[in-house]
């Protein structure tokens, strides 16, 4: 099940243009007015795969209008902005469930990746690669799951399937959760996990799991996300630190962020997020334009003892013009807390993912897996094996980004992909 505007699509700069008419789900053949190609496409898709059923759906205007009114009530935003959120939501979940009827083979994927070939890259994210089909160096995360959680994935899919087209067409019978447990345990030690979702006004459990786990964080939080522009989350983090400080909690707290420098869309929201975390100087033109706000003193008080790094990723390479640098595009949607908890999936740190679009994440309390995520990712980004001491890690990140800044000035190869987030653009739009 997918959104109507995304069926078989790939963007205009991508390999496949069958769905370039995103607003209406048109194919490239239709856009070019090629009736012969249209007929061929229809015949090919009809006969290429037997027993293939595709359903598309969009979020209706009534539900969209309710979403818009909800935003106006809670955030006091302008009618046009509220209408945009309500009228143009998307189905953003990325999930695969295979061989469900065969418990010994059943497998689920809860993903950040889109199902397009040009979202592929290696962990090295080279400056140039003949294997990478399109785009730029690309960093993304997904999970493979087994066991009783497959029933939750199936229920979630069935819900979307029936909403798309309640035709009464049969779907595989829901099996008892227990039948998936034994095959999964043969693969190794299991961990407790659950799915969480965003379904418009119906469910916002991804937002809830972010709020709940941040409230319990005591040592560090790591965000690795395509977007970092959901100000309510920053304000929630500040409220938690303020409450802990008032209760006499003595320890420092560390926030590590890896995200992208925004394009024109979303720059205003990103600035507001960074401003709420006392990092607005990373966007100097916006910082100068907005000056010191009424919240500045509160930011310092709330975040006393909170140490924050906001970073991006890049790679370097020699070209005919000399040394050049390219961003590694971060498409991940991951949060780690205290080497105890992680959530990963399709949800970005923005309003759309937390409150509007349909999203699917997995949430897991597992010291083993959370530490494994952190060690592998931080080694990729910093070029060194991280320790478990967050004060030492914070200093190590600081040293790496300063070293890379000097290397970029001197036109040298980067020592590691991690660089400081910096956006010197003077213009930008609000996008949620």
Range-by-range predicted roles:
Residues 1-216, 258-333, 352-354:
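HKD-type phospholipase D/PLD-like phosphodiesterase module
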Residues 101, 207-222, 240-250:
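Glycine-rich phosphate/diphosphate-binding loops that line cofactor/substrate pockets in enzymes
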Residues 96-98, 213-230, 332-337, 341-346:
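Conserved catalytic-core segments centered on acid/base and nucleophilic motifs
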Residues 108, 113, 207, 231, ...:
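Long, C-terminal catalytic modules of enzymes
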